[in-house]
Swiss-Prot record:
The chain crosses the membrane at residues 13-33, 45-65, 73-93, 174-194. Its main location: membrane. It comes from Pongo abelii. It is found in: Membrane. This is Tetraspanin-31. It is a multi-pass membrane protein. Glycans are attached at residues 100, 109, 117, 134. It holds the Pfam family Tetraspanin. The keyword Transmembrane applies. Disulfide bonds: none annotated. Residues 1-12, 66-72, 195-210 are cytoplasmic. Residues 34-44, 94-173 are extracellular. Keywords: Glycoprotein, Membrane, Transmembrane, Transmembrane helix.
Amino acid sequence: MVCGGFACSKNALCALNVVYMLVSLLLIGVAAWGKGLGLVSSIHIIGGVIAVGVFLLLIAVAGLVGAVNHHQVLLFFYMIILGLVFIFQFVISCSCLAINRSKQADVINASWWVMSNKTRDELERSFDCCGLFNLTTLYQQDYDFCTAICKSQSPTCQMCGEKFLKYSDEALKILGGVGLFFSFTEILGVWLAMRFRNLKDPRANPSAFL
């Protein structure tokens, strides 16, 4: 049977949703693993990652059930939701690739001062740095309370802002690239669902509508 047929479209849509399910379970597992090992203490970060994983899992399950049963309503809502996710993810991915170091520094600086003291302390110890940028009157206060190892090994510690900028630049490029890749898989999912939804099941009653 040619790949444009009913069976091939069904199998392709099922395979795509199985991949989405694996990715969602991976997100949930990594978040739980990070929390269990104490790598990330912020419940907001953990909750956000798990929420994204659960949302993706629900979409994948809906798409898989719709594909297996050729369910018109499920496939319709699957297309709509996946299309909206594509638009949102495409915009975010392009923003990640377009943001410059100056904007990154502004975001890091704004985020730093809304963090709790515990979170800042954990970041300083994890990255072995003290303070953010030596541009504010609070930098010296941060430096005085810093518990990073570098403080006891050398007269001065590298500023956390410099390290954050280095890692954030790399992370944004990776996130933007991966996000764009998944954006195009979502467009593929919308196209497959639309095509499959309009195909007639060869096993169905010939007189039935679709």
